[in-house]
């Protein structure tokens, strides 16, 4: 696997990145960092112009997440800065373990409020240039723009 182009940017912004493997296997599936109570793992696919989100996992006890989208927002910022605005975040939507939120409701959120496209059942794609902060998303919602 090639060197991940996002790691230098993420490191400069205070994150510690490491290889992501499945159950400790020696084969890397991508890279990962932890932020705001979540572990986010991804891999960059240059040919497809996408950042594939491999895993989002709660790493702290469920005490409420400060911002459940902080890790995704950070990854999108890195992709936009390093790869350019025409790359996409891509991944399968599933709720975090122990969440009372349904997968259908989370999928609706991604479609309605973020503008993500559902390419096939449960698989979403969102251009990194369209990613906005949670506070801006709430402002859009409150002003009727979402």
Curated annotation (Swiss-Prot):
It comes from the Bacteria. The keyword Calcium applies. Keywords: Calcium, Plasmid. It holds the Pfam family LcrR. Involved in the down-regulation of lcrGVH transcription in the presence or absence of calcium and is necessary for lcrG protein expression in the absence of calcium. Plays an important role in the regulation of the low-calcium response. This is Low calcium response locus protein R.
